Amino acid sequence: MNEIPKLDVEKTKNDIIEFVQNKVSEANADGLVVGLSGGIDSTLSAFLACEAVGKENVFGIVMPSTTTPTEDKLHGTAIAQLLGIEYKEIAIDSILNEFLSVTQIEDDKLAIGNLKARIRMSIIYFYANSKNYLVCGTGNRSEILIGYFTKHGDGACDIEPIGDLYKTDVYELAKFLEVPQEIINKPPRAGLWNNQTDEDEIGMTYELLDKILYRSTDKKIDSKSIAEELDISVDEVDDIITRVERNKHKTKVPESPKKTTMVI
């Protein structure tokens, strides 16, 4: 009754493709740039981008750093080659190190991790500008809702094709589109620092996270009822709800005070 509805993968694919085609046409753009991390979200986004505008109009960028698992870098380039798209690999460490040498801040793991995401997005937008392409985002609904992305980093894009799909939906659509099994099977990770995985940071599996988010956000069920239904603590539910509220600013245009309150 309160489970996430089963995804109609065929219709979802077609709806996303039509959405992407419309947005590229409206912007009078010539194609799409996609950052290829080697993970399931960017891989699925690249598959959909190729279906929407053709592989000849998709440009992929693989941007490893010293904390990027070798497997992820190899998967990023492998996906570009599998899809037959033009791509470029740019290691970001020289840019990162120059920035850190100027700012002289080298011991803030979170700030440095976010900086990596912002460096990558600057590179992506540079190529998008030069090619008259749109930046194709790779975020999913689960991560967007809890703010599990870097503001003005991996959260910056022109369109977000899979942004309304929960992470569990992403897996279903990826299987339907025949994304390579090794990418589907490996643990999601951002690679912003060593030995990092998404689920460790979030504090629960995506499966449980999605169940909480669907019930609290889509169905508007109260915390106590969700906790009882999922056999977890109310604190676990409230923590996710709090994260959703606390991170709403990440998806909004910066707010300003209303001029009507300032006039005489």
Residue ranges of model-derived segments:
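ATP/NTP-dependent adenylation/nucleotidyl-transfer catalytic domains that generate, transfer
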Residues: 1-32, 44, 48-51, 56-59, ...
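Conserved G/P- and acidic residue-centered "switch" motifs that form tight phosphate/ATP-binding loops
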Residues: 39
